[in-house]
Amino acid sequence: MSTSEFVLAQSATVPAPDIEYGQLSPMLIVFGVAVAGVLVEAFLPRRGRYSSHLVLALGGLTAAFVAVVLLAGTRDSVVGGAVAVDGPTLFLQGTILLISIPAILIIAERSVDSGVAAATAEVTAVRGAEPEGGTDAFTPQAFAVPGSVAEREATRNAPGHTEVFPLTLFAVGGMLLFPASNDLLTMFVALEVLSLPLYLLCGLARRRRLLSQEAALKYFLLGAFSSAFFLFGVALLYGYAGTVALPGIADALARGTEDRTLALIGTALLSVGLLFKIGAVPFHSWIPDVYQGAPTPITAFMAAATKVAAVGAMLRIFYVALPDLRADWRPVMWGVAILTMVVGAVMAVTQNDVKRMLAYSSVAHAGFILTGLVAANRAGLSSTMFYLLAYGFSTLGAFAVVTLVRDSRGEATDLSRWAGLGRRSPLVGGVFALFLLAFAGIPLTSGFVSKFAVFQAALEGGAVPLVLVGVVSSAIAAFFYVRVIVLMFFSEPQSDAPTIVVPSMFTAAAIAVGVVVTVVLGILPQGALDLADQAAVFFR
């Protein structure tokens, strides 16, 4: 072999990357269980799929959370620097997994929809059927035309659409990777992995099929559009810095030897993709339609977990890659946060549908969360992570309650139908009132502590006007929350009042978890606040 051939042979050798499987174990477990779920769909008889999926999903999520706990204190970057394992990553991954476990229970519920038939017989409480014998919230055949013979035949032949379990787990895996991504290409892959299953899941509602399919189509088209903005921003930042690694972009900006116009435009486009996922104004138009049309268990999962993942990714980009552009992005985020809080609160007042009201409430909360990001200090980071934890469980519980109020068409989400609900079922009305009070930020609930924490961090960061707007928006939001409580407890029930379904232990457990977390974080929040503060250091 000649010298040139030897050199060529050496240069053609590509070293295998070092993959730290232990530090990636939470994500690997979830993705592994998701793949196993696909195999269950392919090889197990239909009758055994439901229970197998449920055991796999709950076991996998629990194992992944244990892996997160075992990684506590780790500060490192793995897979060639593409993934960061640090305090914010582990805190947010733990939050996503803890939210996903009760979300799976709500998705697995099969007794609630069985109460619809009983609703036409004016039954006020329906005992749940066994999960294997009942029906879930998902259509058994997604491609069938709504109301067609094929759909009715599929409903008779199949009890449910068990593919929702692996789809949900793939979305969870993408959510775990999203806030951990330490370069922009990995972040884009995570964004698509979490988004694609959600596009499908939004269109699988058993009831109100056309509304569900419309929601899925809107979410897909607008989501693809926002992903294009994100990818274009990645290209421009790469053009400026010569790297997609977040620390590398920060180093290029710190040197400051070139015109930053390319970096500023790239940051703006990148922000569009992230603000869309968060549901911030003016990129919020999809939120009310998708939240209303999607199956309510999926709405609950999206509203809680997706926001955690998207905010985590946004925190990493702005705190790790773009600290030297703080003077440029902070004023813009001020404006976005103010618009989001005000528009979300005002629009929620005008809604007559419970799910749309909660959707605009989610928009307003995105503004409160951005207040912590705008603080641009450690207190802002820790308070934002605490807010995501508190908000996630309250949101999950609130949407779980919505699944229990039903009539012959499915969920009775028209607000007028909730009149007297608290009188007919004090427990259901009281639980929903608790979640609404938490959203309003009333003391002794997690919502009060989380809002106080982000406002205090913003004050430390000099964002006094932003805090004033936040307080006013909270007051506006409190009006429509209290309006619903008054409607439930101080109004006469309608003659054709909806059925209040007694769920199986799955939904009951999910609601109970939401109640416990909302109350405990409101009365004894210090442990979670300290944990968030200890985790509030990014690995660079």
Swiss-Prot record:
GO terms for biological process: ATP synthesis coupled electron transport. InterPro entries: NADH-Q_OxRdtase_suN/2, ND/Mrp_TM. It is a multi-pass membrane protein. It is found in: Cell membrane. The chain crosses the membrane at residues 24-44, 54-74, 88-108, 158-178, 184-204, 219-239, 263-283, 295-315, 331-351, 357-377, 385-405, 428-448, 462-482, 505-525. Belongs to the complex I subunit 2 family. NCBIfam families: NDH_I_N, PRK05777.1-4. This is NADH-quinone oxidoreductase subunit N. It comes from Rhodococcus opacus (strain B4). The gene is nuoN.
